[in-house]
Amino acid sequence: QITVEDMAAYSGVSPRTLTRQFADQLGVPPARWLLERRLAATRALLEETDLPVETIATRIGLSSAVNLRRRFNTALRTTPGAYRRSFR
């Protein structure tokens, strides 16, 4: 699981500096950007595979299926299961 701290260490700056520069350049904080990438990967996996939500959560770097469901529902206003069914 990639964190803001990992990104900052890789970039050779503090997490605070990374957050500021990241938001200045991309318009969103790095944590939000990471979550958006994870949710995009989740959507692709739900559309293209039959992997269980638990496996998808692990694969995209979230701690649990519960965490994935909560974040998915907050962002997309639907559950991962309902989203997958809409592509079947």
Give the positions of each predicted feature.
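Short glycine/proline-centered loop/turn elements that form peptide/ligand docking sites
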Residues: Q1
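Terminal helix-turn-helix DNA-binding modules in bacterial transcription factors
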Residues: V4-E5, D24-A65, R85-R88
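An amphipathic alpha-helical interaction segment
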Residues: D6-A9, T17
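Extended, subdomain-level signal for the structured scaffold at the beginning of enzyme domains
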Residues: A8, L51-P52, R69, T78
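Core residues of bacterial helix-turn-helix
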Residues: Y10-S11, F22, I60-G61, F72
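The short coil/loop that forms the "turn" connecting the two helices of the helix-turn-helix
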Residues: V13, L62-S63, T78
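Base-recognition residues in the alpha-helical recognition helix of bacterial helix-turn-helix
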Residues: T17-Q21, N67-R70
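…primarily DNA-binding HTH/wHTH and HhH modules…
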Residues: V66-R88
